[in-house]
Amino acid sequence: MTATSPYLELGYVARAHGLRGEVAIRALDPASETLDTVDRIWVRTRAGVEREMRLEALRPTPKEDIVVLEGVESRNDAEALVGAKVFVFREDLEPPAEGEFFQGDLVGLDAVDANGNALGRVEEIWTTGEVPNLVIRASGREELVVPFADEFVPTVDLEARRIVIHPPEYVEAGRKGAESGGGPEDAE
């Protein structure tokens, strides 16, 4: 989904829960409380069927939210949703503050270095610590994982679909070693 999309990807339906049609929705960002703030979601099943669904009830748990969705009455109904991607409507969210971004808007941006050289495309965001990490991939290159912090990402231009990256020093050192072969014979 692009920055102009009416939806932002929140997570996915991880599993059916119980016998009465509840589902467990796991957010891509474990710290996200977004589902608490909306009344509806957009669901895309593995079969490609898309539809709006209303939230009737929500119970947060440490790993996921247990949700009752309108029209999902049985375990079979819930199991049919397992693996479905879950999106929220952009219009239902508070806009991000100046200099802040919805993580979903960063996925798909072209990543370049300070000189404009292509590094790849932001394919994923890992939220494993205090700072999210951008996963940048390009054909024929190693995956680049960069902390989403001003020091490493000085510019985000959603209109141009571009992000400027200052890779961490360890990435630059690894790249130089790979270019020269990186073996002890190259250390002279």
Curated annotation (Swiss-Prot):
GO biological process: ribosomal small subunit biogenesis; rRNA processing
Key words, A-Z: Chaperone, Cytoplasm, Ribosome biogenesis, rRNA processing
GO cellular component: cytoplasm; ribosome
InterPro entries: PRC_barrel-like_sf, PRC_RimM, RimM, RimM_N, RimM_N_sf, Transl_B-barrel_sf
Keyword rRNA processing appears in the UniProt entry: yes
Signal peptide as annotated in the record: none
Disulfide bonds: none
Pfam families given in the database record: PRC_RimM (PF24986), RimM (PF01782)
Domain of life of the native organism: Bacteria
Domain PRC barrel: 98-171
Molecular-function GO terms, alphabetical: ribosome binding
Chaperone among keywords: yes
Function: An accessory protein needed during the final step in the assembly of 30S ribosomal subunit, possibly for assembly of the head region. Essential for efficient processing of 16S rRNA. May be needed both before and after RbfA during the maturation of 16S rRNA. It has affinity for free ribosomal 30S subunits but not for 70S ribosomes.
UniProt-listed PANTHER family: RIBOSOME MATURATION FACTOR RIMM
Domain notes: The PRC barrel domain binds ribosomal protein uS19.
Subunit structure: Binds ribosomal protein uS19.
Matching NCBIfam families: 16S_RimM (TIGR02273)
Protein name: Ribosome maturation factor RimM
